Swiss-Prot record:
Upper taxonomic lineage: Bacteria, Bacillati, Cyanobacteriota, Cyanophyceae, Nostocales
Protein name in the entry: Glutamate 5-kinase
The UniProt record lists the keyword Transferase: yes
Residues noted as binding ATP in the record, renumbered to the chain: 8, 168-169, 212-218
Pfam families: AA_kinase, PUA
Database matches in CDD domains: AAK_G5K_ProB, PUA_G5K
Binding site for substrate: 49, 136, 148
Keywords recorded for this protein, A-Z: Amino-acid biosynthesis, ATP-binding, Cytoplasm, Kinase, Nucleotide-binding, Proline biosynthesis, Transferase
Amino acid sequence: MTKTIVVKIGTSSLTQPETGQLALSTIATLAETLSYLRQQGNQVILVSSGAVGVGCARLGLTERPKAIALKQAVAAVGQGRLMRVYDDLFTTLQQPIAQVLLTRSDLVQRSRYLNVYNTFRELLALGVIPVVNENDTVAVDELKFGDNDTLSALVASLVEADWLFLLTDVDRLYSADPRSVPDARPISLVTSIKELADLQVQTGSQGSQWGTGGMMTKISAARIAIAAGVRTVITQGRYPRNIEKIIQGELIGTHFQPQPEPTSARKRWIAYGLVPTGKLYLDSGAIAAIVKAGKSLLPAGVKTVAGEFEPQDAVQLLDPQGNEIARGLVNYSSKDLQQICGRHSKEISTILGYVGAETVIHRDNLVLT
């Protein structure tokens, strides 16, 4: 049966740790593996980091730049080199590829989100392997994915993939960073988000010298992907052939089981495609109504409003301790909501001077996170 497979490979797997130069043998094996999967009738997407790391090596820089303008310039240098290597390797295997550069704003606007989906659909139908990266050269901080783990999970969610492989510099998830804690406990299978939270995994968030994605970003990416029904695996990037073995049933790496009832595409867009512009702190009654009964959010349940937003913007819903429980599209601006929070819906027209929605966020526009 044909599968849709998204593979993300990080800078730490693509480059030599000492020099930042491309690890050509790893990339060649990756190209062979992905081409083989395509020949078996699967649809394959590669999300590749490495543009900044390769650019650093090309320009003789000894560490990843911190200044945004310099980093964007270095990414422009590295992206061309990276794609040339991919194109040369895949061409020898008679496998066409396509470069797809995305920014967060491509997923924020619903129309552009659907356009991206349609582009992927056409490329996959043509038998092409899209090679995806964040468009670091033009991305701004407010609208960045931040790391390609998140980007790969959003792409996997968008195309409703069957598998997401996060290739990294460790062989699986551990209870602590095995590079600094030798007796860290390996974790082979995570069956639910609750189990993931209960593990309280003490992982490093620093990432490698040349990359941006630590283990915490991979856990966050897994959360996004399994909500979309995508089975997610964290495994060693130096051994791309393990992808074939895992698909055939071997339990290599850490597996995250997908949710049995995936969230709808529109709600996934609300939860993960949009960038929240505000926060609503809720009382315990509102939290119970949303989480346990699937109700809409009413103004009476809102205790505090933070941030500035307009109607139909995305906001985070938080408990009194600041833990996120949901996201949604709000029916009122922050200015109006500050006036009606804590009040009954029947008082809205009197307070605001116009007849608005009874709900702050309707349940159709609300998704638990």
